[in-house]
Amino acid sequence: MGVSILTVYAFSSDNWRRPVSEVDTLMKLFHDYVRREGQRLAENDVRLSIIGRRDRLSLGLVRDVERIEAKTAGGCRLHLRVAIDYSSRHAILEAAKAAFLGLPEAKNSRGGPLDPSPGAPLAPDVDLLIRTGGEKRLSDFLLWESAYAELWFSDTMWPEFAAAELSNAIADFRRRDRRFGRVSNAA
Protein backbone atom coordinates (compact mmCIF):
# COMPACT_ATOMS: atom_id res chain seq x y z
CA MET A 1 0.00 0.00 0.00
CA GLY A 2 3.01 2.28 0.27
CA VAL A 3 2.44 3.22 3.93
CA SER A 4 5.67 3.63 5.88
CA ILE A 5 4.35 5.51 8.93
CA LEU A 6 0.99 4.87 10.58
CA THR A 7 -0.15 6.90 13.57
CA VAL A 8 -3.25 5.77 15.45
CA TYR A 9 -5.06 7.74 18.14
CA ALA A 10 -5.57 5.29 20.99
CA PHE A 11 -6.36 7.64 23.87
CA SER A 12 -6.69 11.41 23.93
CA SER A 13 -5.73 13.49 26.95
CA ASP A 14 -9.41 14.47 27.14
CA ASN A 15 -10.35 10.79 27.55
CA TRP A 16 -9.25 10.99 31.19
CA ARG A 17 -12.65 12.67 31.76
CA ARG A 18 -14.45 9.42 30.96
CA PRO A 19 -15.71 7.17 33.78
CA VAL A 20 -12.84 5.64 35.78
CA SER A 21 -13.98 2.10 34.94
CA GLU A 22 -13.83 2.87 31.20
CA VAL A 23 -10.37 4.49 31.49
CA ASP A 24 -9.10 1.51 33.50
CA THR A 25 -10.43 -0.90 30.87
CA LEU A 26 -8.84 1.07 28.01
CA MET A 27 -5.47 1.24 29.79
CA LYS A 28 -5.60 -2.49 30.54
CA LEU A 29 -6.40 -3.26 26.89
CA PHE A 30 -3.49 -1.12 25.73
CA HIS A 31 -1.11 -2.65 28.26
CA ASP A 32 -2.21 -6.16 27.25
CA TYR A 33 -1.67 -5.25 23.58
CA VAL A 34 1.86 -3.99 24.24
CA ARG A 35 2.78 -7.16 26.16
CA ARG A 36 1.10 -9.52 23.70
CA GLU A 37 2.11 -7.93 20.39
CA GLY A 38 5.59 -6.57 21.12
CA GLN A 39 7.39 -9.70 19.97
CA ARG A 40 5.27 -9.97 16.82
CA LEU A 41 5.97 -6.33 15.94
CA ALA A 42 9.71 -7.00 16.24
CA GLU A 43 9.47 -10.19 14.15
CA ASN A 44 7.61 -8.28 11.42
CA ASP A 45 10.18 -5.45 11.35
CA VAL A 46 7.67 -2.92 12.74
CA ARG A 47 8.97 -0.07 14.86
CA LEU A 48 6.66 0.98 17.70
CA SER A 49 6.72 4.51 19.13
CA ILE A 50 4.35 5.99 21.65
CA ILE A 51 3.59 9.70 21.37
CA GLY A 52 1.90 11.67 24.10
CA ARG A 53 2.40 12.19 27.79
CA ARG A 54 3.77 9.33 29.85
CA ASP A 55 3.66 10.96 33.26
CA ARG A 56 0.02 9.97 33.84
CA LEU A 57 0.41 6.36 32.67
CA SER A 58 1.09 3.53 35.11
CA LEU A 59 4.74 2.80 35.80
CA GLY A 60 4.27 -0.79 34.58
CA LEU A 61 2.81 0.38 31.27
CA VAL A 62 5.61 2.91 30.76
CA ARG A 63 8.25 0.24 31.47
CA ASP A 64 6.68 -2.21 29.02
CA VAL A 65 6.28 0.50 26.36
CA GLU A 66 9.93 1.54 26.70
CA ARG A 67 11.05 -2.11 26.51
CA ILE A 68 9.07 -2.71 23.30
CA GLU A 69 10.19 0.62 21.80
CA ALA A 70 13.81 -0.42 22.39
CA LYS A 71 13.20 -3.92 21.03
CA THR A 72 11.56 -2.61 17.83
CA ALA A 73 13.78 0.47 17.34
CA GLY A 74 15.44 -1.03 14.26
CA GLY A 75 12.17 -1.88 12.52
CA CYS A 76 11.97 -0.40 9.03
CA ARG A 77 9.01 -2.13 7.35
CA LEU A 78 6.51 0.14 9.15
CA HIS A 79 6.76 2.79 11.85
CA LEU A 80 3.66 2.37 14.03
CA ARG A 81 3.09 5.43 16.22
CA VAL A 82 0.42 5.09 18.89
CA ALA A 83 -0.90 8.31 20.43
CA ILE A 84 -1.82 7.72 24.04
CA ASP A 85 -2.59 10.52 26.51
CA TYR A 86 -2.01 12.74 23.50
CA SER A 87 -3.16 16.31 22.85
CA SER A 88 -1.99 18.47 19.95
CA ARG A 89 -2.80 21.59 21.92
CA HIS A 90 -0.62 20.44 24.80
CA ALA A 91 2.23 19.46 22.44
CA ILE A 92 2.11 22.80 20.61
CA LEU A 93 2.00 24.77 23.88
CA GLU A 94 4.95 22.81 25.27
CA ALA A 95 6.92 23.40 22.05
CA ALA A 96 6.15 27.13 22.18
CA LYS A 97 7.19 27.26 25.82
CA ALA A 98 10.46 25.44 25.03
CA ALA A 99 11.14 27.84 22.13
CA PHE A 100 10.42 30.87 24.32
CA LEU A 101 12.79 29.58 26.99
CA GLY A 102 15.44 28.72 24.38
CA LEU A 103 15.50 25.04 25.27
CA PRO A 104 17.30 22.71 22.83
CA GLU A 105 14.24 20.46 22.41
CA ALA A 106 12.48 23.38 20.71
CA LYS A 107 14.43 22.73 17.49
CA ASN A 108 13.13 20.24 14.96
CA SER A 109 14.67 18.42 12.01
CA ARG A 110 12.62 20.44 9.50
CA GLY A 111 14.65 23.51 10.37
CA GLY A 112 11.73 25.27 12.03
CA PRO A 113 11.62 26.74 15.50
CA LEU A 114 9.05 24.35 16.95
CA ASP A 115 8.75 20.62 17.33
CA PRO A 116 5.14 19.97 18.39
CA SER A 117 6.03 16.46 19.55
CA PRO A 118 8.96 16.93 21.96
CA GLY A 119 10.26 13.63 23.21
CA ALA A 120 8.63 11.75 20.35
CA PRO A 121 10.33 10.56 17.19
CA LEU A 122 9.70 13.24 14.58
CA ALA A 123 7.60 12.02 11.69
CA PRO A 124 6.93 13.72 8.39
CA ASP A 125 3.76 15.72 7.95
CA VAL A 126 0.59 13.66 7.63
CA ASP A 127 -0.41 12.87 4.04
CA LEU A 128 -3.75 11.19 4.71
CA LEU A 129 -5.81 11.47 7.88
CA ILE A 130 -8.56 8.86 8.14
CA ARG A 131 -11.31 9.51 10.67
CA THR A 132 -13.51 6.53 11.51
CA GLY A 133 -16.76 6.25 13.44
CA GLY A 134 -18.78 8.77 11.45
CA GLU A 135 -17.23 11.77 13.21
CA LYS A 136 -16.30 14.87 11.17
CA ARG A 137 -13.73 16.44 13.47
CA LEU A 138 -10.00 16.13 14.20
CA SER A 139 -10.39 15.83 17.99
CA ASP A 140 -7.06 17.49 18.84
CA PHE A 141 -5.11 14.91 16.80
CA LEU A 142 -1.88 15.87 15.01
CA LEU A 143 -3.10 19.39 14.31
CA TRP A 144 0.37 20.74 13.47
CA GLU A 145 1.39 17.74 11.38
CA SER A 146 -1.95 17.68 9.51
CA ALA A 147 -1.78 21.22 8.11
CA TYR A 148 -1.89 19.93 4.51
CA ALA A 149 -3.27 16.46 5.13
CA GLU A 150 -5.98 15.06 2.92
CA LEU A 151 -8.99 14.05 5.02
CA TRP A 152 -11.03 10.89 4.52
CA PHE A 153 -14.07 10.12 6.67
CA SER A 154 -15.63 6.71 7.28
CA ASP A 155 -18.81 5.75 9.12
CA THR A 156 -17.16 2.45 10.07
CA MET A 157 -16.09 2.16 13.70
CA TRP A 158 -12.34 1.64 14.21
CA PRO A 159 -12.52 -2.02 15.36
CA GLU A 160 -14.39 -2.94 12.15
CA PHE A 161 -12.24 -0.80 9.82
CA ALA A 162 -10.69 -3.43 7.55
CA ALA A 163 -8.01 -3.63 4.86
CA ALA A 164 -10.51 -3.20 2.01
CA GLU A 165 -11.70 0.15 3.35
CA LEU A 166 -8.12 1.25 3.98
CA SER A 167 -7.33 0.37 0.36
CA ASN A 168 -10.29 2.49 -0.78
CA ALA A 169 -9.08 5.44 1.29
CA ILE A 170 -5.56 5.16 -0.13
CA ALA A 171 -6.87 4.81 -3.71
CA ASP A 172 -9.00 7.94 -3.22
CA PHE A 173 -5.99 9.77 -1.77
CA ARG A 174 -3.85 8.87 -4.80
CA ARG A 175 -6.43 10.45 -7.14
CA ARG A 176 -6.35 13.79 -5.33
CA ASP A 177 -4.48 16.88 -6.52
CA ARG A 178 -2.32 17.88 -3.54
CA ARG A 179 -1.43 21.55 -3.93
CA PHE A 180 0.09 22.58 -0.58
CA GLY A 181 -1.24 26.13 -1.06
CA ARG A 182 -0.39 26.35 -4.76
CA VAL A 183 -2.78 26.66 -7.70
CA SER A 184 -4.15 23.39 -9.08
CA ASN A 185 -1.81 21.42 -11.33
CA ALA A 186 -4.65 21.31 -13.89
CA ALA A 187 -4.78 25.13 -14.15
List each language-model region with its residue ranges.
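Flexible, compositionally biased loop and terminal segments
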Residues: 1-187
